[in-house]
């Protein structure tokens, strides 16, 4: 496999799409040896087929604000690869949304979904609409206008969107209500639904819970556990909240959360009422964490910085892509970090990942660590198809088993001759091989 040539061709076809190209190159570097051991992959041109989406759908979304002013946003749905099941991936509403970010997320989703062992292909979508600062009525009108364009493209056996940044329970509700009106059917076409109307228990916290389960499995390979460890977590949304909750439950002390304005350092640990307050912070719609220190004066707010300068044993970045750079990685290593588990999608830059690998610490990528969210979405799809619901305890138990299985796949495919586990390589190989063989079985279609 000539990775340099493949990347040159992709850069020519997709100029300026840095996030997408970064994600593709990481996967290609990981799977190179396995790919070359299977000439049937090359004969079927699997690489060129898998790095290009099946289709990209772009549409305008017209909506009216509370003052009667008409706005126009861009909407997207990328159906990347459906070899192992219906396209599956979230919708992101954020001003930063563009094709490069959605293609990177959709590409990662292929392998993440493959790792769960559930029958789900990879997709992603969203809009540059910003729900922050909007009234409920404005968000509802936007969601209805968005679904007016999207509904013909999706279906429970075709493409099943979910939430992501900017798309929580409120937005999923408005989207589903409009879909139901247009399609005149009550089906599992979206996941992340309310528990009263087809949703799964445990969905909001599933990504964070799964990330912590994965970190625990990583530490177990060294005869260690999260009990008694100090943990730095970035972000303060659903993923961070779930991670803080589960890490605390397993005996760790979480000392940081963060937002766009800076980070909170709480030496006493974020637990109990402090975890509940995280939900109030998010519900305030202000996207800041500084008010935490007003509620809990013993905590410290560090403006404009990320939490990776704090001395901790474990780091779980749960905010956004490329939030952890080389300097951040070096700070963590200098302060004795032993495990980094990516709760967000691609939060570490290539330079940061190289630093962790060179130091031979435990490091695992988002496509494995945060797969608990989409795994629980898959469990929601299963419940919808059966017209049946599991308890929170049943869903949590199934999630734990799935995360343990994903970890095992990474270990089996990523362990080198010295016994070091390259979780990036292991996750990429395990996810890729399943999809590649499925594509071979189905021919060129």
Protein language model features and the residues they cover:
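Conserved active-site and cofactor/substrate-binding residues in soluble primary-metabolism enzymes
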Residues: 1, 15-22, 26, 41, ...
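Adenosine-phosphate binding glycine-rich loop
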Residues: 2-23, 218, 333-445
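Flexible, glycine/charged-enriched surface loops at secondary-structure junctions
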Residues: 21, 37-44, 117, 154-163, ...
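Structured beta-strand/loop patches that form or line metal/cofactor-binding pockets in enzymes
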Residues: 40-71
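Glycine/serine-rich phosphate-binding loop and adjoining beta1-alpha1 elements at the start
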Residues: 94, 113-227
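Glycine-rich phosphate/diphosphate-binding loop of Rossmann-like nucleotide-binding domains
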Residues: 191-194, 199-311
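Rossmann-like adenosine-cofactor binding region
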Residues: 262-363, 368
